[in-house]
Amino acid sequence: MSCFSHVMNPITGQNSWQERGDDYDYHLEVANAGFGDMLHDWERNQKYFAALRKTIAGMREAGREVHVLDIGTGTGILSMMALAAGADSVTACEAFLPMANCAEKILAANGAGDKVRLIRKRSTEIQVGEDMPRKANLLVAELLDTELIGEGAIGIYNHAHAELLTEDALCIPARARCYAQVAQSPLAAQWNSLKTIANLDGEPLLHPPEQLKSCQGEAALHDVQLSQLPSSAFRPLTDPVEIFQFDFQRKQEREKQRSQLLKLQSKQPGAAELVFYWWDIQLDDDGEILLSCAPYWAHPQLKELAAEKAKDHPLPNVVPWRDHWMQAIYYIPKPLQLLEAGKSFHLSCHHDEYSLWFDAREEAPTKSVRRHTCTCDLHMTYSRSRIGQLNQSPRNKRYLRYLEESIEAEKSNVLVLGNGCLLGLASSALGAASVLLHEPHRFSRRLIESIVKHNQLKNVQFLDKVEELEDSRLAALTHIFAEPYFLNAILPWDNFYFGTLLTKIKDRLPEGVKISPCSARIYALPVEFLDLHKIRAPVGSCEGFDLRLFDEMVERSAEQAVSLVEAQPLWEYPCRALSEPQEVLSVDFSNFGQEHSLKGSIELKHPRICNGVALWVDWQLVEDNSPRSIVSSGPSEPVVPGEFVKWDMFVRQGVHFPRRPKEAITHLEWSTVFKPLLGELTFSFGQKKL
């Protein structure tokens, strides 16, 4: 049976009805649940198993029976570990029904089907006596996220201790510790604030208005693979400090709100702009089995791991990799200038039931620091990567070079297409006679209007629909400009919506109008990821347990609900290039409606496993041979086969993960079909050994 879903096509900008199986949402949720990433986390699996063995053995030695509760069992892996470690009984709960049904089959396949009581409920809905025969005296759970408490761990543990666990119950993990490190990073700060846009001579063109300067931003975490932030891109102002402990084992309730005020001293001069955050967990009661989510420079086992892995891995990648628990950046509402080493200041740390926030001040605050929110529209409208992109100087210079060479003072009439296109707005400051901004998004327009007003730009008008432009206005246009960037875009080529907008006015444009970008090219690059491929790779077995049924479930769902190409910020996920990039599509925006069907083959120059294909767009601003006329969303430096690729840090690239990567392939075969008027762009890839 099928149903119809309302879907927005980012290339056409049209909503349409698409026929999908009535279980499409189920498949989408299964494919994106992220269980596979956790099961590939060998350190997590080994240490949970070790903690179960140690804890259950200790309870046995003390003459205690062991009755285990596994909250959020997923595949049932922790329940099977508990049985293997000698538990007398195991009760598991899983509220996500597709996963619970899969867990039931996995338990049976591993001979544990009649030994684990599986409850298809949230733990907060379980009744002792009705759902489980007795209270448990050992709780094992994985209820944590990058923020530690963002998935509701505080409330779940409080309920479990009150209703489901004995007075003397033990917990795995037993406790957690949260850490903060204050730092300055001009690069990371670009993800949080808007800089002045200057011309090629450094003279200001657009100043951010006061409401942007005074805005404290959003308190929400910015989760990143912090180990991949170049060491040259930040200045640590303090050592890591412990800010909170969470005792999961104590019977007393865990507080839902706490504050911690720390008096710190700066190690060196700088601006306290941001807080790096991570946590570790002690899985056993003695605190001997430790799992740390620290970035490499603060990892407690860095020396041992470097000695073991440094030959094959860059230093930032010797620590265990995981994508379900990363690190986070929190931005200080008002950066604090610390002018000398040894300068004292106060770090104010806060958490509620689900989140954290921070502030840094010279003097201790006299009252509690409230969680801050955006008041300027920038942070609530744009993603972190888009804010950073607006500040990206090398990229902006290429656009500004084109505009400075192309705009004629008092003569040029410019139509700007895209959301939040400050570079297009800069053409007004460069002297254009008139600037029309296509800005239909409410909050984005409100932000741009504030910038127009603050910079006293008199020749700027806004429009909602390009097709409603009068013929006389279109006939007067000398330039059409875009970055392009649209809020609905996820993959780089979703911004081909620029071409769709052009087709709506193409027949009414004057013959000599200059369109920039004039064309775009998509490139493909076969790569070998160190780790990212694990989010889609089959698990097979984990700690001796057969999880092939889980692999089959995820693969079936992925085939029905996951695009062959997904968006990822590749600067966070190191990969080696296996060849030079190859063009797989070229689009001319003056003839955007033309359909394309292409195929080719890429010869691999480096003998490794191709477990991914990276794709991106190069925008050609003007038809010349200068590399300065190209703005790329891909590598930021030339690609060298066999070497790690350095990626643009302010945009997500496209990635294709082969279902079953083959060893020793020599060629990657590809095909591209593009039907622009339908908004259909499809890629297919095949691995071949010649």
From Swiss-Prot:
CDD domains found in the cross-reference section: AdoMet_MTases
Entry-linked Gene3D superfamilies: Hnrnp arginine n-methyltransferase1 (2.70.160.11), Vaccinia Virus protein VP39 (3.40.50.150)
GO biological process, one term: chromatin remodeling
Keywords, sorted A to Z: Methyltransferase, Repeat, S-adenosyl-L-methionine, Transferase
Free-text disruption phenotype from the record: Death at pupal stage.
Origin organism lineage: Eukaryota, Metazoa, Ecdysozoa, Arthropoda, Hexapoda
Job of this protein: Essential arginine methyltransferase that can both catalyze the formation of omega-N monomethylarginine (MMA) and symmetrical dimethylarginine (sDMA). Specifically mediates the symmetrical dimethylation of arginine residues in the small nuclear ribonucleoproteins SmD1 and SmD3.
Annotated protein name in UniProt: Protein arginine N-methyltransferase 7
EC category name: transferase
GO MF annotations, alphabetized: histone methyltransferase activity; protein-arginine N-methyltransferase activity; protein-arginine omega-N symmetric methyltransferase activity
Family: Belongs to the class I-like SAM-binding methyltransferase superfamily. Protein arginine N-methyltransferase family. PRMT7 subfamily.
Tissues expressed in: Expressed at low level in ovary.
Keyword Cell wall biogenesis/degradation: no
Any Pfam family the entry gives: PRMT_C
UniProt domain SAM-dependent MTase PRMT-type: residue ranges: 14-357, 366-690
Species of provenance: Drosophila melanogaster
PANTHER family in the cross-refs: PROTEIN ARGININE N-METHYLTRANSFERASE (PTHR11006), PROTEIN ARGININE N-METHYLTRANSFERASE 7 (PTHR11006:SF4)
EC number: 2.1.1.-
InterPro entries: Arg_MeTrfase, MeTrfase_PRMT7, PRMT_dom, SAM-dependent_MTases_sf
